[in-house]
Amino acid sequence: MDIVTYGNPVLKKPAVPVKEVTPELRALAQAMLDAMYAADGVGLAAEQVGRTESLCVIDVPPDAQGKDAPLNAGVKMPMVMFNPVVSAPEGSQRGSEGCLSFPGISAQVTRARSVTVDWMGEDGRHYSARVHGLLARAVQHETDHLAGVVFVERVSGTQLLLLKGKLAKLRRASAAAAT
């Protein structure tokens, strides 16, 4: 499964809600997890693999969560989330963020320190969790993808100017790959 890069129009498409979790969607989720692990990522949204279903997968290991690991202890990894909705943001955290669809590019992004996320699981049941720190950042990043928002839209104007050349190069490479 290939991960699409910046410049591919699918990254700007809002996700289509999933009505029912089918065997095909479960297989898609597993393929997305495999692609995410192969790319050393912590999250992946369906748009990043050329699909538009409201689906994202996240796996932030406890050792990567630092001091927030105990706060997220009740959250089972990996998270396979259909129709995730983020609410109740609290606090703020600024940190370096990258994206598998933006290879070699990272920037400082401010996100909520903790959020509540509600979603439908692979079993069709509804779940809710309060997540913190890096896990909250990953959830917000992936749900942004599902809304057609990419992380560089969340960076300051100055940072965006500094990234302009890299983004243009990535967009050209993506366009060339599509032809």
How should each PLM-predicted stretch be described?
Residues 1-140, 145-179:
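Active-site rim/adjacent substrate-binding subdomains
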